[in-house]
């Protein structure tokens, strides 16, 4: 064994102790160093240990918080196809209420010997979560990429949409239609994308915004709820009750709930209330009315996540910073001129 370790160490340009840690699956070895040792095994004709053979089989984990929101299956499809084209097999791991947590899914994937993991809207987006979990994962030599969320505490590549720009697009569109009382329905404030959307919304609704005015805008025009149809319905009901003639929603599912809320109040969309979604989920163009929404660049984000992860796996890691992708406004049938603007020359 000593001779074998010495040969591998010499080929990889590392110490025998490092080779031993890699062969025994011990933490504390950088991903690039681990790959060098595995490459040395192959070059010298040594058979990889069983656990390391599983790792080299090309499994990549994809962790999502749910599949009920159609944006997550859309991400899974794009990422899965991109991985398959590169010879990797995606392993989808989804959290369920009362089921496995993100940490438990991570352990399952690591035990299966995945080459890396992509997290979509995971705990990295929650400002109250312990970010040390990602540092520990990196310490075990498992490359990972984080999609839709950001934390300066984590040294990893992040892939995000420009949430501030998304709100600016939505609000500017509604203002151009004559709306002056615009509400924002979105999820719990502890999430980074939510905080960024609020920033973009407030800045666009009232520029410049003083501290006092910002507080007033948030109190009157921002309603937090859940990222569900029912959550959107509840938030929109509250905003319409505050005389909003337009509602911007942080997801398409919430927007469908907002349309339901308006109808239950005897209002027509878009005649009485305009609604804008976010995501441009599959089939959303076929709702009644077809939903105006801000399109999240899912194909570009998903492909970038795969490309970045494969660079990490291949030993040429991407910069540990945030890659931001621009959204796009898609105007359909759920927005129209503000009620008071109709008939004006």
From Swiss-Prot:
<comment type="function">
    <text>Transcription repressor involved in control of expression of alpha-amylase and chitinase genes and of actinorhodin production.</text>
</comment>
<dbReference type="InterPro" id="IPR000843">
    <property type="entry name" value="HTH_LacI"/>
</dbReference>
<protein>
    <recommendedName>
        <fullName>HTH-type transcriptional regulator reg1</fullName>
    </recommendedName>
</protein>
<dbReference type="InterPro" id="IPR046335">
    <property type="entry name" value="LacI/GalR-like_sensor"/>
</dbReference>
<keyword id="KW-0678">Repressor</keyword>
<keyword id="KW-0805">Transcription regulation</keyword>
<feature type="DNA-binding region" description="H-T-H motif">
    <location>
        <begin position="5"/>
        <end position="24"/>
    </location>
</feature>
<dbReference type="GO" id="GO:0003700">
    <property type="term" value="F:DNA-binding transcription factor activity"/>
</dbReference>
<dbReference type="Pfam" id="PF13377">
    <property type="entry name" value="Peripla_BP_3"/>
</dbReference>
<keyword id="KW-0238">DNA-binding</keyword>
<dbReference type="InterPro" id="IPR010982">
    <property type="entry name" value="Lambda_DNA-bd_dom_sf"/>
</dbReference>
<dbReference type="InterPro" id="IPR028082">
    <property type="entry name" value="Peripla_BP_I"/>
</dbReference>
<keyword id="KW-0804">Transcription</keyword>
<dbReference type="GO" id="GO:0000976">
    <property type="term" value="F:transcription cis-regulatory region binding"/>
</dbReference>
<dbReference type="Pfam" id="PF00356">
    <property type="entry name" value="LacI"/>
</dbReference>
<feature type="domain" description="HTH lacI-type">
    <location>
        <begin position="1"/>
        <end position="58"/>
    </location>
</feature>
């Amino acid at each position: 064994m000593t001779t074998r370790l010495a040969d591998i160490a010499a080929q990889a340009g590392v110490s025998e102790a490092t080779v031993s840690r890699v062969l025994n699956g011990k933490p504390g070895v950088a991903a690039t160093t681990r790959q060098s040792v595995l490459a040395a095994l192959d070059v010298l004709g040594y058979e990889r240990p069983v656990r390391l053979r599983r790792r080299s089989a090309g499994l990549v984990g994809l962790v999502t918080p749910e599949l009920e929101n159609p944006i997550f299956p859309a991400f899974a499809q794009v990422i899965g196809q991109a991985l398959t084209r590169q010879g990797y097999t995606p392993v989808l791991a989804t959290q369920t209420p009362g089921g496995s947590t993100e940490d438990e899914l991570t352990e399952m994937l690591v035990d299966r010997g995945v080459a890396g993991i992509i997290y979509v809207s995971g705990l990295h987006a929650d400002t109250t979560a312990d970010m040390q979990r990602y540092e520990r994962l990196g310490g075990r030599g498992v490359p990972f990429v984080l999609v839709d969320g950001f934390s300066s505490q984590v040294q990893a590549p992040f892939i995000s949409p420009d949430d501030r720009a998304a709100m600016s697009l939505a609000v500017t569109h509604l203002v151009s239609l004559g709306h002056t009382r615009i509400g924002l329905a979105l999820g719990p404030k502890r999430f980074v994308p939510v905080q960024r959307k609020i920033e973009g919304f407030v800045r666009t609704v009232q520029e410049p915004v003083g501290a006092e005015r910002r507080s007033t805008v948030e109190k009157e025009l921002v309603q937090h709820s859940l990222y569900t149809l029912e959550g959107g319905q509840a938030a929109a009901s509250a905003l319409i009750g505050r005389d909003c003639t337009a509602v911007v929603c942080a997801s398409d599912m919430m927007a469908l709930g907002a349309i339901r809320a308006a109808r239950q109040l005897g209002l027509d969309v878009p005649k009485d209330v305009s609604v804008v979604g976010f995501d441009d989920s599959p089939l959303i163009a076929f709702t009644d009315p077809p939903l105006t929404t801000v399109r999240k660049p899912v194909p570009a984000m998903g492909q970038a996540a795969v490309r970045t992860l494969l660079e990490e796996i291949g030993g040429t890691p991407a910069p540990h910073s945030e890659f931001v992708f621009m959204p796009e406004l898609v105007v359909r049938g759920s927005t129209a001129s503000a009620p008071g603007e109709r008939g004006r020359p």
